[in-house]
Amino acid sequence: GESGSGKTTIRSHLLSAFLSFSSTPLSSKLSYAAFLFDTLTTTKSLTTQTASKAGLFLELQYDGSSSVNPTLIGGKIIDHRLERSRITSVPTGERSFHVLYYLLAGTSPAEKAHLGFDKAVHVSTSSGAIGHKRWRYLGHPTQLKVGVNDVEGFQHFKTALRKLEFPRSEIAEICQILATILHIGQLEFASGQATTTHAEESGGYSHEGGETVTIVKNKDVLSIIAAFLGLSVEDLENSFGYRTKTIHRERVTVMLDPKGARQNADELARTIYSLLVAYVIEAVNQRICAAEDSVANTISIVDFPGFAQACATGSTLDQLFNNAATELLYNFCLQSFFDRKADELEREEVSVPATSYFDNTDAVRGLLKHGNGLLSILDDQTRRGRTDNQLLESLRRRFENKNPTIIVEGSKRTSLISQNARSAFTVKHFAGEIDYSVNGLIEENGEFISGDLMRLMKSTKSDFVRELFGQAALQTVTHPKEKTAIMQAQVSSKPLRMPSMARRKTSPSSRLAFDAGDADEVESQAESIAKDSSSGRRKSAMLTSGIQGAAGQFLSSLDIVNKCLSSTNLNPYFIFCLKPNDRRIANQFDSKCVRAQVQMFGIAEISQRLRNADFSVFLPFAEFLGLAEIGNIVVVGSDKEKAEVVLDEKRWPGNEARVGSTGVFLSERCWADLAKVGERVVPVYAADMSDEGGDGLLHPRSTGYGDSKVRLLNPADQSPGAFIYGDEAKQGYFGSRDLDGRSDAGNSAFNSGDMFRNHETREQMLEKGNEKKMEEVDDAPISGSRKRWIALVYLLTFYIPDFAIKLFGRIKRKDVRMAWREKFAINLIIWFSCGVAIFFIVAFPGLVCPTQHVYSAAELSSHNGKDGHSSFIAIRGVVFDLDKFMPGHYPHIVPESALKKYAGVDATGLFPVQVSALCQGKSGSVDPTVLLDYRPTNISGSATTISGTDTNSVYHDFRHFTNDSRPDWFYEQMVMLKANYLKGYVGYTPKYLNTLGKKSQSIGSINGKVYDLTSYIAGGRLTKAPPGETVPSDVDTDFMDNSVVSLFQSLPGQDLSKHWENLKIDALRRRMQLCLDNLFFVGHVDTRNSAQCEFARYFILAISVLICSIIVFKFLAALQFGRKNVPENLDKFIICQVPAYTEDEESLRRAIDSMARMRYDDKRKLLVVICDGMIIGQGNDRPTPRIVLDILGVPESVDPEPLSFESLGEGQKQHNMGKVYSGLYEVQGHIVPFLVIVKVGKPSEVSRPGNRGKRDSQMVLMKIPERVHYNLPMSPMELEMHHQIRNVIGVNPTFYEFILQVDADTVVAPDSATRMVAAFLNDTRLIGVCGETALTNAKTSAVTMIQVYEYYISHNLTKAFESLFGSVTCLPGCFTMYRIRSAETAKPLFVSKEVVDAYAEIRVDTLHMKNLLHLGEDRYLTTLLLKHHSKYKTKYISSAKAWTIAPESWTVFLSQRRRWINSTVHNLIELIPMQQLCGFCCFSMRFVVFVDLLSTVIQPVTLAYIIYLIYWLVKDTSTIPYTSLILLAAIYGLQALIFIIRRKWEMVGWMIVYLLALPVFSLPCPSTLSGTWTTLPGVTHVSSQERKAGKVVISDEGKFDPASIPKKKWEEYQTELWEAQTSRDDRSEVSGISYGTKSYHPAQSEYGFPGSRPMSQLDLPRFGSRMSLAPSEMMSRHADMEMENLSHLPSDDAILAEIREILRTADLMSVTKKSIKLELERAFGVNLDLKRPYINSGKGYTFPFPVLRTVC
């Protein structure tokens, strides 16, 4: 029937009817099993709420103990092809599989919290779905409420699992996996920048952290998924961002964009659900299936999804499979009614009228025929790795004009555009024509699960997930050479079990059905997969593995079904389901709709056939007569005549009963009548179902079990559960007794409470998943410096206990806690350094010379309110702010101009004082009539004092004798003025006090305060009474003690503090002090020019000047004037290395072309490109190695075998494999030899195969010269590189003296190599040279703009200064040339054993080593060169230019600077202890290195100081810090002079941009450094107290055995080469490459693969190696020659000596083999044709480049 016609419903009724005959615990289990199948595989579609989306072959198994009343002994569910696409693509208006909705709706709040359903996700804003959560995999939120009782469904689901004996823990795991699938749909992906550096990062831009990666935005959802799958969050997130595929026979990792990551996540969801369904069904079958030998008969229900007119989920493959299965079943139906019956009738000589019918055999044959049917072709094309268009072409060739039911559109000559538009084929099904698109069909048919996912799941900590991915339903493809390496996998589209009848051959006692031949065929088809032998060249993984695609598996499963149905002893029954209307309206009959279905299924023709011949059963005469029981009737004649008598007696119609030649044909009705089926007593069995633990035995009962008969007819007992259809009151598989038969507490808690109560929490699972695998390794000694550092770390962090880090930081591992302590200690050191810097800048001067708020007379007079100056005024030694005071002066009638005339002067005379109010005198009181005539000292020598005769003084005179006496007025005013307007005090320097003392002034200082008693001693003590009163006669005007007065008289102008303390006036001291402070105080001692203050001032100044002097020195070093003469042509051999990672083609082409176009002798350049892994970067359409090879012109047909070499990595990752290509690259007239090394990794590597990082790429090239110079054994790939350089390119590797390292995003100037080599030749003590690097993307963004000036000045100032000492501390890896060996002694330098071993360190077990090796390998390489070759120099030359790409985004820029600062700090720490750094005085490099280190750490303080200076200048224009400004001007002015002198006028603008961005460089970078100082997630070797061995390694790569990589010396290699070639005459060592010719014999390697063919018209030397498989045209012919008398010819040794002499004096640019032969013939005077093979072989010598052509 069609979809929505009720097939699933009727199937459930049918099953219930069968099970009602044996109501046993087993029948209940079978009912539960069918319900589980429906729950997992049915969905709500547009036409029905129970649309089946998987084919079902449901088998009920019976024993043969009773031929009349067989016993039900088991059952089997065989599922066919679940519609997996529905999981991730829910059609509009439909639902996904019911179980997902059950889980969401039926879980309790506690369970929802555990499953992560309690968090709001994607809340829809549409009016129709307010409040619903939007789940991507559940369709529109309205589908959550469509009349299906999901809550009850979930309870039934759990009950069914428990009744089928699933453990509770397993049920919980199943629910977790289902929740995981829903959460995978919620993941949101975005593009981000990789800001965390790993050891595997490589290349230029990408190495700087600029690699675009895909990240998960909602990390909370990701953590839920990781917890339930038992995986690490980081590993899971990374796995979504890439996918490993097999492209052109190569494993390639594709870096995915967010869209690709979404597809990757969808694949994961489909895979998990498919495996879960397979797992549950197989587990159910294990519980219900009987032993195959005990099964005698079966009743099978076959139900496949209905015919699909449209592709609802977008999966053409699912639609094709569904319709193919429906086509097959319909064809079987027609065959059963027409063809098979006709054959039997004809054989029995029974004639019936013929009936015409629609025959769909052509469609079935076209779709399902083995070998050349459509599904077979699809599978074959998938296995061959063909494209969709190639599939279409194959279908066209197969079916065009050959099968009318399959039409392939278009033709061969169709244009590409129209071909893509028409890429579809049409199948004429019995139900109508359907167009199937081929776009993506090949890939969909593969249904491959990437090896990345399998590798990820291999690391799961969840036993259940491990079991899911370990079941037989998951077919894996392993590498042919490494069986443990899973390349890819596939969820089987074929059932795990076969029908019982397919397993059994025909037996006499059973009607279970195959004959021997069919049974053997089906058995072999089901249990074995043909293995394709892989001979010759390597094929795709699918072709070599023999794994079938989905089409092949589905076809074989349909074939088994068809053979089972077509078996001879099977009786088929057909049920046609017709839907009454297309609109799902109850009680409405649409005749048009029904008529269309009747016509489609040919029901009228079938009915007509049955009217003519309704013969379902054929009985031989003996069996028929036995059933007819004619023993009492005497009939004389043959059996046939007796049968005719019986038929006449029964009076059955002729279309239901006919006599044949050997038996009788009967209809079902006639057979039932004959066998008296209705009269038999069918015993009904029952068992105690109150407890699952019952005996399970069957007990005959006199009456039927409960409702065993009612279930067949009662509409209240619908199946499979009326809740699926939306009627909660109805019961289906479950009666009220079955929903939950047990009432114990545990069960009810499980059913309605929290099934995860005794389960691990999500947090525990997440922590378990994040744990690293640990295994023991050998103990490694800890260095003394490391021990001292650890001691310092604990000293700084001892107050933080380990348990606190473990508890609050959630850090369980001891090594990570130690790393955290180190980070925290480093933070403390950084901030302590900043604090020390702040202390010296701010606090230190204040401590040595406390700040004084004093003003000298000159300073006071300068504050006169004129020319923008402020207005200050002094009163009795106290300085006030007149500007602030004037607006509030009372009375307001006094104009401000009148007040301003007092600005800058001492106005003490304006304020007469009442002595008695301010001084208690000697006796405790002073007579109020006593006056003090105070005249302030004129300390400036100018008119800065106001006399007491000033007219305004009367306004402040409130003394006793006035008519307005206010004794305390002055004191109150001073208190108010000091509180609001105080600026400081009048200052007297000790020197000036001494001067005044010499001028007979009675002035002195006590404890820093200056007192002037001159007027008191000179007679200024007066008396005056108020008007009308007289002055008492006994007034004592001497209110000061004589000892005090005499002290000032005897020691004028001095510090009287000690003398004051020694006075014997203890009783009077307080009163005298009060009088001095109130009446005679004139200011403070000014110590600003004292020795301590001068020290404080000049100490900071000296440091500033010292640092600035370094700047000056750097400036002088940068002024390297002189003519930039272009050197003469140089004859040194150089290697130009370019590491490639994920760069785009444009960047790679620019870099490679710029190297090739350098104005340096092409024959002496070797371009080496090292591709770090088989990776397709985002935005690229090919792997990076393929891009490089395409640029260099290497065709895809050149495919060398990968060879082993030792790499930098953890564990087994140290074993890497690589391919070697060589040839000539021609660009713009330059022809340059090249070598390409492609790191492809071992077969077991499925993720980023071969990728080991930039440092490893450098090591690949560094090890070759090292092995050569030290004559060390080489790995196979190194031997091949040596062979390619020496024998193919034609240059002895020892000739190369320099290596130029350039990043893949860097473009070099044409003369850069020439200038660098010239520098090396001018100074033989030079080991490394770098040039000036500028930016190509300077104006791309604001981030790049702020870097332009910094790049320029860092080269032309810092590096130029370091170059003066020959100690450039950082030779950038993007543009540096190194000296490979010493010019005089050939001693290895760059490739010396010490440097190579130190640089190849793989134990990165500390933060320090991680910062050295992973964050700044270029700088560390320079550090190693300076450490191990201290007598050699590193240099910077500005004449060599290159241009690179700077980070364009803020995130990448900060990431880059964080790594740079980390690397700088740690490398400077390495350099500081070195004694060998050159220099002189305080300008030694050690000092400069220390200053650089310190300046890097305290950059935030520097920025803060500059901001403070600016604030100071803005706030107080009167006080200008000239020194600071001069120093700053010197720093930046000298920098400006550099580019001004060099006429780099554009740098003026870039300098302004840089200065504006100074906060960016000074604050965020160091603060980011300290806040997120490099973490240690990749710690590999750490101490652990938990392991007695002392060390553990955290690695899942296994241990590396160096013996797994065979090594041999070059001499051994050559010896074996010679022996191999002399022992066999069919192989010549002269099997070279003739490039540019049509006949070409590749140079072979020892390892048996053809060499590469560069694209050039030149011929490379024909050197082969031992195991060359392709014969050369120069095959040795010694064995075929006639043995002549060769005594007159010179010996080989003589020829060799003469050749060497010729080469020593010949022009190597023009010499050829032919010219050498002619020279030899002249020298020896004989014809040397017989010696030609020896001359051409090159034994004992090597022809130099250019290659000598074999033309003799």
Swiss-Prot record:
- State its location(s): Cell membrane; Cell septum; Cell tip
Concerning CDD domains, the annotation shows: MYSc_Myo17
Q: Which SMART domains match?
A: Cyt-b5 (SM01117), MYSc (SM00242)
Give residues annotated as binding ATP: G1, E2, S3, G4, S5, G6, K7, T8
- Every copy of the Cytochrome b5 heme-binding domain together lies at 852-940
A single GO molecular function term of this UniProt record = cytoskeletal motor activity
Gene Ontology, cellular component aspect: cell septum; cell tip; myosin complex; plasma membrane
Protein name as annotated: Chitin synthase E
Identify the species of origin: Aspergillus fumigatus
